[in-house]
Protein backbone atom coordinates (compact mmCIF):
# COMPACT_ATOMS: atom_id res chain seq x y z
CA UNK A 1 0.00 0.00 0.00
CA UNK A 2 1.27 3.45 -0.84
CA UNK A 3 2.19 5.54 2.18
CA UNK A 4 0.66 8.99 1.90
CA UNK A 5 1.25 11.18 4.91
CA UNK A 6 -0.06 14.57 3.81
CA UNK A 7 -3.29 15.59 2.07
CA UNK A 8 -5.51 18.62 1.76
CA UNK A 9 -9.26 18.28 1.88
CA UNK A 10 -12.25 20.61 1.97
CA UNK A 11 -15.04 20.05 4.44
CA UNK A 12 -18.42 21.72 4.28
CA UNK A 13 -20.99 21.42 7.04
CA UNK A 14 -24.66 21.59 6.10
CA UNK A 15 -26.60 24.85 6.37
CA UNK A 16 -29.37 25.02 8.91
CA UNK A 17 -32.83 24.40 7.47
CA UNK A 18 -35.22 27.38 7.26
CA UNK A 19 -37.93 27.86 9.81
CA UNK A 20 -41.34 28.35 8.31
CA UNK A 21 -43.65 31.31 8.61
CA UNK A 22 -47.07 29.80 8.51
CA UNK A 23 -50.55 31.17 9.16
CA UNK A 24 -53.67 29.09 9.27
CA UNK A 25 -55.90 31.80 7.96
CA UNK A 26 -54.68 34.13 5.32
CA UNK A 27 -52.58 36.82 6.99
CA UNK A 28 -54.22 36.11 10.31
CA UNK A 29 -52.77 34.23 13.15
CA UNK A 30 -54.75 31.15 14.10
CA UNK A 31 -56.01 30.37 17.54
CA UNK A 32 -53.06 29.26 19.56
CA UNK A 33 -50.76 31.45 17.48
CA UNK A 34 -48.76 30.91 14.30
CA UNK A 35 -47.64 27.33 13.76
CA UNK A 36 -44.62 27.35 11.42
CA UNK A 37 -42.07 24.78 12.60
CA UNK A 38 -38.33 25.29 13.08
CA UNK A 39 -35.92 24.05 10.46
CA UNK A 40 -33.49 21.24 11.24
CA UNK A 41 -29.81 21.82 12.03
CA UNK A 42 -27.31 21.17 9.28
CA UNK A 43 -25.00 18.18 9.61
CA UNK A 44 -21.55 18.79 11.10
CA UNK A 45 -18.32 17.27 9.86
CA UNK A 46 -16.06 15.31 12.20
CA UNK A 47 -12.76 13.52 11.76
CA UNK A 48 -12.43 10.30 13.69
CA UNK A 49 -9.37 8.14 14.30
CA UNK A 50 -9.54 4.50 13.28
CA UNK A 51 -6.70 2.13 14.17
CA UNK A 52 -7.50 -0.06 11.16
CA UNK A 53 -6.38 2.65 8.75
CA UNK A 54 -2.74 3.44 8.11
CA UNK A 55 -2.70 5.83 5.21
CA UNK A 56 -4.39 9.02 4.04
CA UNK A 57 -4.22 7.93 0.43
CA UNK A 58 -7.99 7.78 -0.08
CA UNK A 59 -8.23 11.50 0.57
CA UNK A 60 -5.79 12.30 -2.17
CA UNK A 61 -8.48 11.39 -4.64
CA UNK A 62 -11.53 12.28 -2.57
CA UNK A 63 -11.06 15.87 -1.52
CA UNK A 64 -14.56 17.26 -1.01
CA UNK A 65 -16.63 16.23 1.94
CA UNK A 66 -20.02 17.76 2.54
CA UNK A 67 -22.66 17.14 5.19
CA UNK A 68 -26.31 17.69 4.23
CA UNK A 69 -28.27 20.79 5.11
CA UNK A 70 -31.10 20.58 7.62
CA UNK A 71 -34.55 20.24 6.13
CA UNK A 72 -36.95 23.16 6.30
CA UNK A 73 -39.67 23.35 8.90
CA UNK A 74 -43.30 23.00 7.89
CA UNK A 75 -46.63 24.24 9.04
CA UNK A 76 -48.56 22.65 11.91
CA UNK A 77 -45.47 22.86 14.08
CA UNK A 78 -43.56 20.34 11.97
CA UNK A 79 -39.89 20.69 12.80
CA UNK A 80 -37.40 20.07 9.99
CA UNK A 81 -35.10 17.10 10.32
CA UNK A 82 -31.56 17.58 11.58
CA UNK A 83 -29.16 16.19 9.03
CA UNK A 84 -26.78 13.38 9.85
CA UNK A 85 -23.25 14.37 10.74
CA UNK A 86 -20.54 13.35 8.33
CA UNK A 87 -17.76 11.38 9.97
CA UNK A 88 -14.52 11.07 8.06
CA UNK A 89 -12.33 8.21 9.22
CA UNK A 90 -8.57 8.78 9.36
CA UNK A 91 -5.62 6.82 10.77
CA UNK A 92 -4.58 7.23 14.40
CA UNK A 93 -1.80 9.84 14.42
CA UNK A 94 -3.50 12.32 12.09
CA UNK A 95 -2.82 15.98 12.82
CA UNK A 96 -5.35 18.52 11.54
CA UNK A 97 -4.64 22.07 10.48
CA UNK A 98 -6.83 24.80 8.97
CA UNK A 99 -4.99 25.75 5.79
CA UNK A 100 -6.42 29.29 5.64
CA UNK A 101 -5.78 30.34 9.24
CA UNK A 102 -2.80 28.02 9.85
CA UNK A 103 -4.56 27.11 13.10
CA UNK A 104 -3.96 23.66 14.51
CA UNK A 105 -7.31 21.99 15.12
CA UNK A 106 -6.00 18.99 16.98
CA UNK A 107 -4.31 15.65 16.95
CA UNK A 108 -6.11 12.34 16.73
CA UNK A 109 -3.89 10.12 18.80
CA UNK A 110 -6.32 7.49 20.06
CA UNK A 111 -8.61 5.04 18.35
CA UNK A 112 -12.16 6.38 18.33
CA UNK A 113 -11.17 9.94 19.17
CA UNK A 114 -13.26 12.47 17.27
CA UNK A 115 -12.79 16.16 16.45
CA UNK A 116 -15.41 18.58 15.15
CA UNK A 117 -13.94 20.32 12.10
CA UNK A 118 -16.97 22.09 10.58
CA UNK A 119 -20.05 22.91 12.57
CA UNK A 120 -23.43 22.49 10.96
CA UNK A 121 -25.60 25.59 10.58
CA UNK A 122 -28.16 26.34 13.28
CA UNK A 123 -31.77 25.96 12.23
CA UNK A 124 -34.02 28.88 11.36
CA UNK A 125 -36.89 29.45 13.77
CA UNK A 126 -40.46 28.95 12.68
CA UNK A 127 -43.06 31.53 13.54
CA UNK A 128 -44.69 29.15 16.02
CA UNK A 129 -41.91 30.38 18.30
CA UNK A 130 -43.39 33.82 18.46
CA UNK A 131 -46.51 33.73 20.55
CA UNK A 132 -48.64 36.83 20.29
CA UNK A 133 -52.26 37.65 20.13
CA UNK A 134 -51.81 40.42 17.63
CA UNK A 135 -52.09 40.08 13.93
CA UNK A 136 -48.45 40.77 13.27
CA UNK A 137 -45.61 38.72 11.93
CA UNK A 138 -42.18 38.09 13.45
CA UNK A 139 -39.25 40.19 12.49
CA UNK A 140 -37.07 37.20 13.23
CA UNK A 141 -35.14 35.93 10.25
CA UNK A 142 -36.18 32.43 9.55
CA UNK A 143 -33.26 31.26 7.46
CA UNK A 144 -30.90 28.83 9.11
CA UNK A 145 -27.27 29.88 9.54
CA UNK A 146 -24.64 28.64 7.13
CA UNK A 147 -22.60 25.56 7.84
CA UNK A 148 -18.88 26.07 8.39
CA UNK A 149 -16.52 25.49 5.51
CA UNK A 150 -12.84 24.74 5.99
CA UNK A 151 -9.83 23.73 4.00
CA UNK A 152 -7.85 21.27 6.04
CA UNK A 153 -4.39 19.86 5.88
CA UNK A 154 -4.18 16.36 7.30
CA UNK A 155 -0.80 15.01 8.27
CA UNK A 156 -0.18 11.51 9.44
CA UNK A 157 2.52 11.46 12.08
CA UNK A 158 3.86 8.17 13.21
CA UNK A 159 3.23 7.41 16.84
CA UNK A 160 6.53 6.04 18.01
CA UNK A 161 8.38 6.31 21.30
CA UNK A 162 11.80 6.17 19.71
CA UNK A 163 12.97 7.64 16.41
CA UNK A 164 16.04 6.65 14.43
CA UNK A 165 18.08 9.43 12.95
CA UNK A 166 21.10 9.25 10.73
CA UNK A 167 22.75 9.44 7.33
CA UNK A 168 21.69 7.06 4.60
CA UNK A 169 23.50 3.76 4.92
CA UNK A 170 24.23 4.24 8.64
CA UNK A 171 22.35 1.05 9.45
CA UNK A 172 19.00 2.36 10.75
CA UNK A 173 16.93 -0.28 8.99
CA UNK A 174 19.37 -2.98 9.99
CA UNK A 175 18.99 -1.84 13.59
CA UNK A 176 15.17 -1.94 13.56
CA UNK A 177 15.35 -5.41 11.99
CA UNK A 178 17.68 -6.60 14.71
CA UNK A 179 15.59 -5.37 17.65
CA UNK A 180 12.02 -5.83 16.40
CA UNK A 181 9.99 -8.04 14.12
CA UNK A 182 9.87 -5.31 11.45
CA UNK A 183 11.66 -6.27 8.25
CA UNK A 184 12.36 -3.13 6.22
CA UNK A 185 14.63 -3.42 3.23
CA UNK A 186 18.37 -3.13 3.87
CA UNK A 187 20.92 -2.49 1.13
CA UNK A 188 24.43 -1.20 0.68
CA UNK A 189 23.40 1.98 -1.09
CA UNK A 190 21.96 5.26 0.25
CA UNK A 191 18.24 6.00 0.32
CA UNK A 192 17.15 2.42 0.57
CA UNK A 193 14.36 3.43 2.92
CA UNK A 194 11.85 5.68 1.19
CA UNK A 195 8.95 5.51 3.59
CA UNK A 196 8.92 5.30 7.37
CA UNK A 197 8.72 1.91 9.09
CA UNK A 198 7.55 1.09 12.58
CA UNK A 199 8.72 -1.79 14.74
CA UNK A 200 7.65 -2.95 18.19
CA UNK A 201 10.48 -3.74 20.56
CA UNK A 202 9.83 -6.09 23.50
CA UNK A 203 12.70 -5.98 25.99
CA UNK A 204 10.65 -8.10 28.42
CA UNK A 205 7.47 -10.13 28.22
CA UNK A 206 5.12 -7.37 29.30
CA UNK A 207 7.09 -4.32 28.24
CA UNK A 208 7.28 -2.78 24.81
CA UNK A 209 7.92 0.38 22.90
CA UNK A 210 7.58 1.48 19.30
CA UNK A 211 10.53 2.51 17.20
CA UNK A 212 10.40 4.43 13.90
CA UNK A 213 12.87 4.04 11.07
CA UNK A 214 12.79 6.94 8.64
CA UNK A 215 14.66 7.66 5.41
CA UNK A 216 18.22 8.89 5.87
CA UNK A 217 19.04 12.58 6.10
CA UNK A 218 21.95 14.27 4.38
CA UNK A 219 23.65 17.61 4.70
CA UNK A 220 21.50 20.30 3.06
CA UNK A 221 18.32 18.27 3.58
CA UNK A 222 16.61 21.37 4.99
CA UNK A 223 17.19 22.96 1.57
CA UNK A 224 15.77 19.91 -0.16
CA UNK A 225 18.89 17.79 -0.66
CA UNK A 226 18.32 14.04 -0.80
CA UNK A 227 14.79 13.27 0.31
CA UNK A 228 14.59 16.54 2.23
CA UNK A 229 13.56 16.88 5.85
CA UNK A 230 9.88 16.14 5.44
CA UNK A 231 10.26 12.84 7.26
CA UNK A 232 11.52 14.53 10.40
CA UNK A 233 7.93 15.32 11.29
CA UNK A 234 7.53 11.66 12.14
CA UNK A 235 10.03 12.14 14.93
CA UNK A 236 8.05 15.00 16.51
CA UNK A 237 6.10 12.66 18.73
CA UNK A 238 9.03 10.46 19.66
CA UNK A 239 10.33 10.78 23.18
CA UNK A 240 13.88 9.65 22.50
CA UNK A 241 15.97 9.91 19.35
CA UNK A 242 18.72 7.44 18.54
CA UNK A 243 21.33 8.97 16.31
CA UNK A 244 22.93 6.11 14.39
CA UNK A 245 26.48 6.85 13.32
CA UNK A 246 28.45 4.65 10.93
CA UNK A 247 31.97 4.48 12.37
CA UNK A 248 33.49 3.21 9.12
CA UNK A 249 31.67 4.91 6.23
CA UNK A 250 32.43 3.23 2.88
CA UNK A 251 32.78 6.62 1.21
CA UNK A 252 35.66 7.43 3.57
CA UNK A 253 33.81 10.41 5.08
CA UNK A 254 34.54 11.50 8.63
CA UNK A 255 31.99 10.19 11.19
CA UNK A 256 32.38 13.38 13.24
CA UNK A 257 31.51 15.66 10.30
CA UNK A 258 28.66 13.33 9.42
CA UNK A 259 27.25 13.52 12.93
CA UNK A 260 27.45 17.31 13.02
CA UNK A 261 25.68 17.51 9.67
CA UNK A 262 22.72 15.57 11.06
CA UNK A 263 22.51 17.67 14.22
CA UNK A 264 22.62 20.80 12.09
CA UNK A 265 19.72 19.61 9.92
CA UNK A 266 17.77 18.75 13.05
CA UNK A 267 18.18 22.31 14.37
CA UNK A 268 17.19 23.72 10.97
CA UNK A 269 14.02 21.68 11.04
CA UNK A 270 12.91 22.40 14.58
CA UNK A 271 14.71 23.57 17.71
CA UNK A 272 12.07 21.71 19.71
CA UNK A 273 12.95 18.44 18.02
CA UNK A 274 16.65 19.14 18.54
CA UNK A 275 16.00 19.45 22.29
CA UNK A 276 14.66 15.93 22.66
CA UNK A 277 16.90 13.38 24.37
CA UNK A 278 19.24 12.16 21.65
CA UNK A 279 21.58 9.26 22.24
CA UNK A 280 24.60 8.44 20.11
CA UNK A 281 24.73 4.93 18.70
CA UNK A 282 27.98 4.07 16.97
CA UNK A 283 27.27 1.30 14.51
CA UNK A 284 29.28 -1.27 12.53
CA UNK A 285 31.90 -1.83 15.23
CA UNK A 286 32.27 -5.38 13.87
CA UNK A 287 34.33 -3.88 11.04
CA UNK A 288 37.25 -3.36 13.41
CA UNK A 289 38.99 -5.40 16.08
CA UNK A 290 37.32 -4.77 19.44
CA UNK A 291 40.07 -2.63 20.95
CA UNK A 292 40.41 -0.46 17.84
CA UNK A 293 36.65 -0.04 17.68
CA UNK A 294 36.57 1.03 21.31
CA UNK A 295 39.36 3.58 20.80
CA UNK A 296 37.71 4.95 17.65
CA UNK A 297 34.32 5.37 19.33
CA UNK A 298 35.91 7.18 22.26
CA UNK A 299 37.73 9.50 19.89
CA UNK A 300 34.58 10.31 17.93
CA UNK A 301 32.60 10.94 21.12
CA UNK A 302 35.30 13.24 22.39
CA UNK A 303 35.37 15.22 19.16
CA UNK A 304 31.61 15.52 19.30
CA UNK A 305 31.88 16.75 22.89
CA UNK A 306 29.60 14.01 24.20
CA UNK A 307 30.21 12.06 27.37
CA UNK A 308 26.86 10.49 28.19
CA UNK A 309 24.41 8.13 26.59
CA UNK A 310 26.80 6.69 24.06
CA UNK A 311 26.47 3.15 22.77
CA UNK A 312 28.63 1.13 20.41
CA UNK A 313 26.87 -1.65 18.57
CA UNK A 314 26.89 -3.91 15.60
CA UNK A 315 23.36 -3.89 14.28
CA UNK A 316 24.11 -6.65 11.83
CA UNK A 317 25.46 -9.01 14.52
CA UNK A 318 23.00 -7.82 17.18
CA UNK A 319 25.93 -7.18 19.49
CA UNK A 320 25.45 -4.67 22.33
CA UNK A 321 21.91 -3.91 21.22
CA UNK A 322 20.37 -5.42 24.37
CA UNK A 323 21.88 -2.94 26.89
CA UNK A 324 20.77 -0.09 24.62
CA UNK A 325 17.21 -1.41 24.40
CA UNK A 326 17.12 -1.96 28.14
CA UNK A 327 18.24 1.62 28.87
CA UNK A 328 15.74 3.03 26.37
CA UNK A 329 12.92 1.14 28.08
CA UNK A 330 14.04 2.40 31.50
CA UNK A 331 14.12 6.01 30.33
CA UNK A 332 10.73 5.71 28.62
CA UNK A 333 9.20 4.33 31.80
CA UNK A 334 10.47 7.30 33.77
CA UNK A 335 9.02 9.84 31.32
CA UNK A 336 5.50 11.22 31.52
CA UNK A 337 3.37 10.35 28.50
CA UNK A 338 3.04 13.42 26.36
CA UNK A 339 -0.37 15.04 26.45
CA UNK A 340 -1.77 15.98 23.12
CA UNK A 341 -4.39 18.64 22.47
CA UNK A 342 -7.64 16.86 22.04
CA UNK A 343 -11.30 17.61 22.03
CA UNK A 344 -13.45 15.14 23.84
CA UNK A 345 -17.00 14.25 22.91
CA UNK A 346 -18.19 16.08 26.03
CA UNK A 347 -16.49 19.29 24.94
CA UNK A 348 -18.08 19.01 21.51
CA UNK A 349 -21.51 18.49 23.11
CA UNK A 350 -20.88 21.39 25.45
CA UNK A 351 -19.99 23.76 22.62
CA UNK A 352 -23.00 22.65 20.71
CA UNK A 353 -25.32 23.22 23.71
CA UNK A 354 -23.94 26.70 24.29
CA UNK A 355 -24.57 27.48 20.67
CA UNK A 356 -28.18 26.38 21.02
CA UNK A 357 -28.68 28.40 24.18
CA UNK A 358 -27.29 31.52 22.56
CA UNK A 359 -29.52 31.10 19.55
CA UNK A 360 -32.57 30.52 21.73
CA UNK A 361 -31.77 33.61 23.79
CA UNK A 362 -31.42 35.67 20.64
CA UNK A 363 -34.86 34.60 19.52
CA UNK A 364 -36.34 35.65 22.88
CA UNK A 365 -34.71 39.05 22.59
CA UNK A 366 -36.07 39.46 19.10
CA UNK A 367 -39.50 38.37 20.10
CA UNK A 368 -41.31 41.47 19.06
CA UNK A 369 -43.80 41.83 16.32
CA UNK A 370 -43.92 44.17 13.47
CA UNK A 371 -45.87 44.80 10.33
CA UNK A 372 -44.89 41.83 8.25
CA UNK A 373 -43.57 42.16 4.74
CA UNK A 374 -43.39 38.92 2.81
CA UNK A 375 -40.48 40.19 0.69
CA UNK A 376 -38.26 40.36 3.74
CA UNK A 377 -38.33 36.62 3.97
CA UNK A 378 -36.59 34.35 1.61
CA UNK A 379 -38.61 31.38 2.73
CA UNK A 380 -41.61 29.46 1.72
CA UNK A 381 -44.73 30.89 3.34
CA UNK A 382 -47.60 28.51 3.85
CA UNK A 383 -51.18 29.65 4.18
CA UNK A 384 -53.67 27.09 5.22
CA UNK A 385 -57.42 27.32 5.54
N1 LIG B 1 29.33 -4.48 8.83
C1 LIG B 1 28.17 -3.97 9.15
N2 LIG B 1 27.34 -3.53 8.19
C2 LIG B 1 26.15 -3.02 8.55
C3 LIG B 1 25.75 -2.92 9.89
N3 LIG B 1 24.54 -2.34 9.93
C4 LIG B 1 24.19 -2.12 8.65
N4 LIG B 1 25.17 -2.52 7.82
C5 LIG B 1 25.15 -2.46 6.36
O1 LIG B 1 25.06 -1.10 5.96
C6 LIG B 1 24.28 -0.98 4.76
C7 LIG B 1 23.15 0.00 4.99
O2 LIG B 1 22.26 -0.52 5.96
P1 LIG B 1 20.77 0.00 6.09
O3 LIG B 1 20.22 -0.61 7.33
O4 LIG B 1 20.03 -0.21 4.83
O5 LIG B 1 21.02 1.55 6.31
P2 LIG B 1 19.95 2.72 6.52
O6 LIG B 1 20.51 3.64 7.53
O7 LIG B 1 18.63 2.16 6.79
O8 LIG B 1 20.01 3.42 5.09
P3 LIG B 1 18.87 4.29 4.33
O9 LIG B 1 17.62 3.51 4.36
O10 LIG B 1 19.40 4.45 2.97
O11 LIG B 1 18.80 5.59 5.05
C8 LIG B 1 23.80 -2.39 4.44
O12 LIG B 1 24.63 -2.93 3.49
C9 LIG B 1 23.94 -3.12 5.76
O13 LIG B 1 24.13 -4.50 5.62
C10 LIG B 1 26.66 -3.40 10.90
O14 LIG B 1 26.41 -3.36 12.10
N5 LIG B 1 27.83 -3.89 10.45
MG1 LIG C 1 16.93 2.29 5.76
From Swiss-Prot:
InterPro entries: G_OBG, GTP-bd, GTP-bd_Obg/CgtA, GTP1-OBG_CS, GTP1_OBG_dom, GTP1_OBG_dom_sf, OBG_GTPase, P-loop_NTPase. Keywords: Cytoplasm, GTP-binding, Hydrolase, Magnesium, Metal-binding, Nucleotide-binding. NCBIfam families: Obg_CgtA (TIGR02729), PRK12297.1 (NF008955), PRK12299.1 (NF008956). This is GTPase Obg. Residues 1-159 form the Obg domain. The keyword GTP-binding applies. Pfam families: GTP1_OBG, MMR_HSR1. Belongs to the TRAFAC class OBG-HflX-like GTPase superfamily. OBG GTPase family. It is found in: Cytoplasm. Monomer. The gene is obg. Mg(2+) binds at residues 173, 193. The keyword Hydrolase applies. GO terms for biological process: ribosome biogenesis. Its cofactor is Mg(2+). One of its GO terms (cellular component) is cytoplasm. An essential GTPase which binds GTP, GDP and possibly (p)ppGpp with moderate affinity, with high nucleotide exchange rates and a fairly low GTP hydrolysis rate. Plays a role in control of the cell cycle, stress response, ribosome biogenesis and in those bacteria that undergo differentiation, in morphogenesis control. Its main location: cytoplasm. GTP binds at residues 166-173, 191-195, 213-216, 283-286, 314-316. One of its GO terms (molecular function) is GTPase activity. Residues 160-333 form the OBG-type G domain. Its EC number is 3.6.5.-.
Amino acid sequence: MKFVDEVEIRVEAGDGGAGIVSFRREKYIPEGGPDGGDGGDGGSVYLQADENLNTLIDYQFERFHRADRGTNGRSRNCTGKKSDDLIIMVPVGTRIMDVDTQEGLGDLTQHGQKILVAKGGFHGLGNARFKSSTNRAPRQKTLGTEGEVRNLKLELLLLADVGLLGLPNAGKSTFIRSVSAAKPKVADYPFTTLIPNLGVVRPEANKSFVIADIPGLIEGASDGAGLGIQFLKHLERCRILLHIIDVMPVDGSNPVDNAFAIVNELHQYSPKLAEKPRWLVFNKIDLLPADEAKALCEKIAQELGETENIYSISAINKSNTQPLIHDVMTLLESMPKEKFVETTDEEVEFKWDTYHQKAAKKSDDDDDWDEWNEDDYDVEVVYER
